[in-house]
Amino acid sequence: MTTIHTLGFPRMGAQRELKFALEKRWRGEISADGLEAVGRELRARHWALQREAGLDFVTVGDFAFYDHVANHIQLLGCEPARFGFAGQEPELARYFTMARGAAGEAPACGCGQIHGADASGKPALEMTKWFDTNYHYLVPEFTPETGFHLASERLFDEAAEARALGHPVKAVLVGPLTFLWLGKEKAERLAAHACPLPGPLPRGEGEIPFDRLALLEKLLPVYCEILVRLKGAGVEWVQMDEPILGLDLPAAWKKSFEGAYWRLASTGAKLLLATYFAALEENLRMACQLPVAGLHVDAVRVPQELIGAADWLPAHKVLSVGIVDGRNVWRTDPDAALAALRPVYEKRAGNLWLAPSCSLLHVPVSLEAETGLDEELKSWLAFAVEKLGELSMLKHALAEGEASVAVELAAARAALASRRSSPRVRNPRVAERLAGLPADADRRASPFAVRQAVQRARFNLPRFPATTIGSFPQTAEIRAARAAFRRGETGEEEYRCRMRAEIAVAVKKQEELGLDVLVHGEPERNDMVEYFGEQLAGFVFTRNGWVQSYGSRCVKPPVIYGDVSRPAAMTVEWTAYAQSLTARPMKGMLTGPVTILQWSFVRDDQPRADTALQIALAIRDEVADLERAGIGIIQIDEPAIREGLPLRRAQWQAYLAWATRAFRVSASGVADGTQIHTHMCYSEFNDILPEIAAMDADVITIETSRSDMELLRGFGDFNYPNEIGPGVYDIHSPRVPAVDEMVRLLEKAAAVIPAGNLWVNPDCGLKTRGWPETEAALANMVEAARRVRMSIV
């Protein structure tokens, strides 16, 4: 009989219960035990949902209070030494210190860092994208001295929880090669260094280079110990996630798989090697030959490899087919799925497993709460719970015939037919505009050097101009005002007055702090993508379709179901009002077409490039309206531009061609004196710098503080021609950076980028921070800018 399972399940809960519990814990409103109780309740509920859907195993090890990679850092005993843990701190406290950093009161010394016995500020672990998704993981830090040991009982406790509830258990681990790949080599501290800095040194300042793959021999015994423990606890199967098999791996990493998995196989554990997100290509045959009990392949992203996997995987091994899309919300086409599965089922019915393509972490929990969606559109969708139901339907259709699930199949087919024929999906006017787009619609009128001179004459900004990325703290009062307006409890005029008052507060605070280019603070915006999607045709919004971005941060991606257009101006009123309150330049704040695309659930019935260009034209219209309203600086955020890169380098150029063109189309309809900014975060750009330069933004701001300006070196080596604002402090941590710390970062930046082209700004928007820490950090940032204006020629 075919087995069905899931690679993972959403953690936050249907009502974001984990988010609210985490934030209460961080505010000191509940105890650690209270948070653990919420975790137990959510795990029990999610396991019950899996069993109710007919899954043969529940998955254990996918739950995390912040991030599953951070769970592994503790499980494997490799918490970075720079945090200075003495061994007495509670495990959960150490976990959150790694994730969020720790503030301190000790003064800074001449080294430019805060440190000392009083608990210096401890910057959080770097955070970056999980492959090409919108989920963020915490980056492990490795040095040659990094050791590993089994240091947490959490995984085993959760397996015991599930078994005590009567569930058959499949555990999931990030595989050893992927765990090492996800980390970074960090600097060794020179023993003679007089000042023990709280963060890693950049290369060249005391670092002894090494390859983290060299740590594999120290790591494997701990994995073996974990597998032995799980087997002894009655866990029959362990899913080993090795998605790096879909990457362009160096030869040494490929070669390491065979030896590593022979070591792991010696434990006697049944291992399911799980791959997803990309084609295995040359790694497929090797994956089929590894000494594991089964292999999972992503048949949604890579349907062409399914038959190869079925042919090459030995008949006695399990083939797990990711046949339901774990990353998007559209209902599965049962006829296409069954057509793909039947040849495989005929070959290996007893050793065929069905699953989502990847963990369901990337989709909302359930459609049950979506009472606001019209029934036609709702019928086109499937969230995590519904996707489990689709697996059950496919299992029974294969094993017992379609008649056994005739009702379910009929409903799925009717929904698909409705979507294909619905007039709401296609807009002839959008098609006409795309067809008539001029060839030069993606080019500014003049080159950057000409524009820069015009803009400098217009704005007369000081060197190292200080600004922010866009959003300011979203207080409980702001959120309550928006919620009351959405519920119809307050009228439109009252709401507008309240938002204007918040904008006025933000403008006043920025002027008092001494910022040079201001923003309106975005109090009216719930999310940088959702806000725009709500005002664009072709989008629909869920009531409770939340997915985890990082930690407690959840986003509610819009669903792009049809052609995109802009019925009316979206931001002009708020930005123009903010500009009326100050003589300083006010930035218009927009989200770029690629980011809107990447952070939405995108229609799958046309190429993503076509949808991106539709969005670009809508943003272009908004840029033109802002310019007409007198807004001279317009920021078009594209934090997701690198996230969209295919995982295989051979496919990069095609993606970058349409992605950068979409940005240029959105930004190029303005005069030379209008300054276009863009912002990118969580990104490493060195391998795509020509394409970043080709976007031709007048100013780019990027996240660099967590990497100690490491990301900026590539811009300097490339001689990046335009202006750049490297983030000088990490907004994801409540820690307030010292002035000297930011001065040091700016001095490092000025060593690789011409000082006249540098801006001063935080890493990202300040929406998730509180006002006291925001004002303190920005005051220090402005002072840092003042100092470097005086010290750097």
Where are these regions (language model features)?
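Domain-level signal for soluble alpha/beta catalytic cores
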Residues: 1-193, 208-793
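A cross-taxon signal for low-complexity, glycine/charged-rich
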Residues: 197, 202-207
